[in-house]
A protein has these predicted regions:
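Glycine-rich beta-alpha junction loops
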Residues: 75-78, 146-150
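Hydrophobic residues within well-ordered alpha-helices
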Residues: 133-134
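Acidic/histidine-rich catalytic neighborhood of metal-dependent amide-processing enzymes
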Residues: 1-100, 107, 122, 126, ...
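Short catalytic/ligand-gating loop segments at beta-alpha or beta-beta junctions
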Residues: 110-128, 147
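Short hydrophobic alpha-helical runs that function as membrane-insertion/retention elements
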Residues: 141-144
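His/Asp/Glu-rich mid-to-C-terminal helical/loop segments that flank catalytic regions of hydrolases
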Residues: 150-218
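Structured lumen-facing ectodomains of secretory-pathway proteins
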Residues: 105-109, 197
Length: 218
């Protein structure tokens, strides 16, 4: 792998660890389960006959019947001041799946409005571990960050070209040029500490705190 992965995904790991410490010391009750995963680039481990990364966890969740939790993939959250709620996954399955996904999606939008007023967007995100859960028929939402200028430019392109949404989700070659710079930095030597932004930490702290206080029942 090229680069140190400062944004993808060291920043989010650090943010979630700090959040876990707060959950443990400052809240009398919460219904949060935190799972860290790695090795998604490996894919299927043919020697041990199992999936790596989030796909392995998603397959276990499905086998155990854990399909009603609100699942979030916290991914690449160290650069930017705008919270991004991924719309990727909508209309990806049966009517039952779509209903559950839309309920989770709308609840996430409400959390974004409360925690990051006027500093959030919802757009298609062509990466993140929520895709593994969606592939297993389990609704999951990706949460990430972008600088305001990049988020605004990307949204304008989506508004100009209504086919672009599908191109992004399917990772079409035609969509690569319009993707935000932050995403283009992933897996390159530009994914470094120097390209992280200090304001990202407060944005994520606000969202994660709102998520902990939500206490929605699965």
């Amino acid at each position: 792998r090229i680069g140190i992965g400062a944004n993808d995904n060291s920043a989010a790991v650090y943010q979630v660890i700090k959040w876990a410490q707060k959950l443990n010391t400052q809240l009398d009750f919460h219904n949060i389960r935190i799972i860290f995963t790695d090795g998604e680039e490996i894919g299927f481990d043919s020697e041990n006959k199992n999936f790596q990364g989030a796909l392995g966890i998603a397959s276990i969740f499905k086998r155990l019947g854990l399909t009603n939790d609100d699942i979030y993939a916290i991914d690449s959250c160290g650069r930017g001041d705008v919270l991004v709620v991924s719309s990727t996954g909508k209309n990806s399955g049966s009517k039952d799946f779509t209903k559950k996904f839309n309920n989770l999606y709308e609840n996430t939008i409400e959390l974004a409005k409360k925690s990051c007023p006027e500093k959030w967007v919802t757009i298609p995100v062509p990466y993140s571990d929520n895709a593994s859960f969606v592939a297993m028929g389990i609704p999951a939402i990706a949460i990430t960050l972008l600088p305001k200028t990049e988020a605004t430019s990307y949204m304008r392109e989506l508004q100009k070209n209504h086919n672009l949404n599908n191109d992004v989700v399917n990772r079409s070659e035609t969509s690569k040029d319009i993707l935000p710079l932050t995403w283009k930095m992933m897996h390159t030597d530009q994914d470094c500490i120097e390209n992280l932004t200090i304001e990202s930490w407060s944005v994520m702290e606000n969202f994660l705190d709102a998520l902990a206080k939500d206490k929605s029942l699965a």
